[in-house]
């Protein structure tokens, strides 16, 4: 009996040992790396990555702190919606109905086309208005047409204008040049020009003027050639107050003397073809001051006059050059 029990116990031990050996072989086969198995050993460059590295435990508890995406998510703004107020039909009608006391304003034009010329037409239909310049040349005008307030340059040459009235240029504070060449102007009112603060150039050749009006102090260029101007028609000291006068052209008139005194700003004086026979010793120079010089006055024309310039040698000592004229 004991022998049979020993044999049965031995067989059980052998079965368990065989079973354990088979299980060990299976486990070794499963754990042994096969050829081409990329999961057993990964070669990346000079580094070998093993599956065992993936056994590292990663703590995900602090991911919320490490990656805070709150700034990238736009904040939703909630605003209150206001419902449109209901308007009654009577209020709508009241808004659309005009008051019977209201009158529609008619636009006024104070610009170029609002001024009427002597032909009964707007000035800028008879003349040509370009910017602030008005061109009325050869337009059969008999007087100065009403001009736009912004007029800076006026050209009304070769017309039939005979008189300049006191209000012809009223309010034209920006008027810088007036050219009335080739008209029939015989008189200019004393108030027509003197109140023009910006006037610099006054061009009046080929007219019938016997006298000069009062001139504004800002005049720089004065051309009154080919008129009927007489010495008696020029007021005493008419030019001395013109501190900016540089060019004075009085040729081809009826002057019998040189008008003076002349402003120190003068650069050019044309008096040819008049009736001048004599001059004062201080016409150009201050005889009381022998160091006096007038370097700017380089152009004096007295040719075409009966005066003998050699009779007045003391009259030229301050000039940079002698006048042009008769010396014998």
UniProtKB/Swiss-Prot annotation:
Q: Which UniProt keywords apply?
A: Disulfide bond, Extracellular matrix, Glycoprotein, Leucine-rich repeat, Repeat, Secreted, Signal, Sulfation
Which family is this sequence assigned to?
A: Belongs to the small leucine-rich proteoglycan (SLRP) family. SLRP class III subfamily.
Q: What does this protein do?
A: Inhibits angiogenesis in the vitreous humor of the eye, and therefore represses neovascularization. Binds collagen fibrils. May be involved in collagen fiber organization via regulation of other members of the small leucine-rich repeat proteoglycan superfamily.
Annotated glycan sites: 46, 80, 101, 308
Q: In which tissues is it expressed?
A: Expressed in cartilage (at protein level). Expressed in the vitreous collagen, inner limiting membrane, lens capsule, trabecular meshwork, anterior surface of the iris, the area adjacent to the nonpigmented ciliary epithelium, and weakly expressed in the retina of the eye (at protein level). Expressed in the nonpigmented ciliary epithelium of the eye.
S-S bonds? 285-318
One GO cellular component term, please give it: extracellular region
A Pfam family per the record: LRR_8
Q: What is this protein called?
A: Opticin
Where is each LRRNT domain found?
A: 112-149
Which residues in this protein are found as Sulfotyrosine?
69
Modification after translation, per record: O-glycosylated.
Map the LRR repeats onto residue numbers: 150-171, 174-195, 198-219, 244-265, 266-286, 296-316
Q: Give the signal sequence positions.
A: 1-19
Q: Which organism is it from?
A: Mus musculus
Q: If researchers knock out this gene, what phenotype do they report?
A: Increased organization of cartilage collagen fibers featuring more smaller diameter fibers that are closely packed. Dysregulation of small leucine-rich repeat proteoglycan superfamily members in cartilage, including an increase in Lum and Epyc, and a decrease in Fmod and Prelp. In a surgical osteoarthritis model, a reduction in cartilage degradation and inflammatory markers, decreased loss of cartilage integrity, and reduced synovial membrane thickness. Decrease in vitreous body vaso-obliteration upon hypoxia, and an increase in preretinal neovascularization upon restoration of normoxia.
Q: What is the lineage of its organism?
A: Eukaryota, Metazoa, Chordata, Craniata, Vertebrata
- What's the domain of life for this entry? Eukaryota
Complex and partners: Homodimer.
Offer one example of a GO biological process linked to this entry: negative regulation of angiogenesis
Site (Cleavage) at 20-21, 30-31, 111-112
């Amino acid at each position: 009996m004991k022998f049979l029990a020993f044999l049965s116990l031995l067989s059980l031990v052998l079965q368990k040992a065989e079973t354990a050996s088979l299980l060990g072989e299976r486990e070794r086969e499963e754990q042994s790396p096969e050829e081409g198995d990329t999961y057993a050993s990964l070669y990346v460059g000079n580094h070998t990555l093993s599956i065992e590295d993936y056994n590292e435990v990663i703590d995900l508890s602090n991911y919320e702190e490490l990656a805070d995406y709150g700034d990238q998510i736009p904040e939703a703004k909630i605003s209150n919606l206001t419902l449109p107020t209901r308007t009654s039909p009577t209020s709508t009608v009241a808004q659309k109905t005009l008051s019977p006391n209201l009158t529609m304003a008619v636009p006024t034009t104070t610009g170029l086309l609002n001024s009427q010329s002597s032909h009964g037409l707007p000035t800028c239909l008879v003349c040509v208005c370009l910017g602030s310049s008005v061109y009325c040349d050869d337009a059969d005008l008999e007087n100065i047409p009403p001009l736009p307030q912004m007029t800076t340059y006026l050209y009304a040459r070769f017309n039939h204008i005979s008189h300049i009235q006191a209000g012809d240029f009223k309010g034209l504070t920006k008027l810088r040049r007036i050219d009335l060449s080739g008209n029939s102007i015989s008189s200019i009112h004393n108030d027509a020009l003197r109140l023009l603060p910006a006037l610099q150039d006054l061009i009046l050749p080929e007219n019938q003027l016997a006298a000069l009006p009062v001139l504004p102090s800002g005049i720089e260029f004065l051309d009154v050639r080919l008129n009927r101007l007489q010495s008696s028609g020029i007021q005493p000291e008419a030019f001395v107050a013109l501190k900016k006068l540089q060019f004075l052209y009085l040729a081809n008139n009826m002057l019998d003397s040189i008008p003076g005194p002349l402003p120190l700003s003068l650069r050019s004086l044309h008096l040819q073809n008049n009736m001048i026979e004599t001059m004062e010793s201080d016409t150009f120079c201050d005889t009381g001051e022998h160091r006096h010089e007038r370097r700017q006055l380089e152009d004096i024309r007295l040719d075409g006059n009966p005066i003998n310039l050699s009779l007045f040698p003391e009259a030229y000592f301050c000039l940079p050059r002698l006048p042009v004229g008769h010396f014998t």
